[in-house]
């Protein structure tokens, strides 16, 4: 034991010596303070700061291969998900050399408050020490409109011996934030009254579904019928709340009374991370959280539902569609995912719905890839990660922010991450059509996965040379599927409202996946897990193909017909719905009866 400690000490000493003797190199750098921000003041060298380092993972390729095998319905390993955080991390742990190198570098700077967490190293220090360590210049910057302050640096450096082991250090050079994927809440139309709507629901009357969506509309439209889940069968579903939004117990009770009488009495649990709250009296916006909760309960009741409430604000590179980081608040993916991944298997929800997003180009590539990798890790634990595709159609700010100022159809993040299932939007019911704001397109960061290759190639062949140069034809295509995205009846702060957006689509589809998991668990089968390989193969016949309508965008305005944003106009830009997969509605909307039959065959 003593000998091993001596060896470790010697190694740390050597690492420290090497780290300090090799010139540091710039690891990340901004050319200027991002748009919408300005210098506020310089912190004291004694001010505290907390940073975390993402270490390079040992066998990412092997991990991704294992995940694809357990998600492929034709593979013998289908459904054999990792059962613990430790088992899942086994292939992703950094090398001992990486851990010792980075830790030694920190300790040589006098930093002692260090936490090793698998492939992350987190530490607390002071601004003065951080500046010296990273050759940085941390200052306080303030948003010019919202007056939100952030402690950031425009550049930081790492010694060469450390840089080779590191993916990123955060928070450092990134300023930023975003919005939920829904339109501004509007009061109920004159022709829709809560009591009249409730009477229609009680009578099973769905004649008003083109004007207002209720859970019964979705149950009828998506062929759920009288399927009854078992609340004790093991299926669990969750939704993520950010930006100080909290679902309300009273609103859920009123929703159940008026619009989902079969769910009366069902409640939800709340798990809080990173200072997230469960404030039932907040004057802040609660619409997104209430929407997610009410339609997950309304469609999947009585399956248990959890809200993950995560505090904090995330990271952004501003572009024209999100110039004001206070108005467009970026959710703290890292804090949320690191905590959820550590949950015990018997408590981990097998479906997590998230209705937030942003332009892919506003996210630093290293950060985006690290977060997408965390979603893959959830998939390996048997979790279906569901995201709304976005509400900017073809795009809102159709201009690159990399200095080239090219006209471009901007993909969405995390919707274009290949390890999530992205849900676009439809409208009307007889038949359904693609809704104009349903985001879709092709990632600039991720190549197209093999599981969607043939479906997307068929679409691209039909598209031909149209829009050539405005999108990446080799990128991961999204959305994967779609669901209704307009006119959802939601109770918020005691009042009936209607919401639009793919924020509506994601919880509706998530609830259907939770029902599929319920059926599989009751038949002693594993849960669905990462869905996409199954969706594009065995399940492709379980969707209603949407062939009318299309998404629009690139009209020089912010999403939902908003204010001018100064970006280029692409006349008649649109992704049209068509036979097979398309960038407006993916594979189509779910037919639960068909999907249930297909899901039970393996």
From Swiss-Prot:
Q: Where is the active site?
A: 288, 292, 503
Q: Name one GO cellular component term.
A: extracellular region
Q: Signal peptide location in the record? A: 1-23
**Which cofactor is essential here?**
Ca(2+)
Q: How is the cofactor bound?
A: Binds 1 Ca(2+) ion per subunit.
Propeptide found at: 24-205
Describe PTMs of this protein.
N-glycosylated.
The subcellular location is: Secreted, Extracellular space
Which keywords annotate this record? Answer: Calcium, Glycoprotein, Hydrolase, Metal-binding, Protease, Secreted, Serine protease, Signal, Virulence, Zymogen
Q: Which residues are recorded as binding Ca(2+)?
A: 545-546, 580, 582
Q: How does activity depend on pH?
A: Optimum pH is about 6.
- Tree of life domain: Eukaryota
Stretches assigned to coiled coil: none
Query: What's this protein's function?
Result: Secreted tripeptidyl-peptidase which degrades proteins at acidic pHs and is involved in virulence.
**Protein name per its UniProtKB record:** Tripeptidyl-peptidase sed2
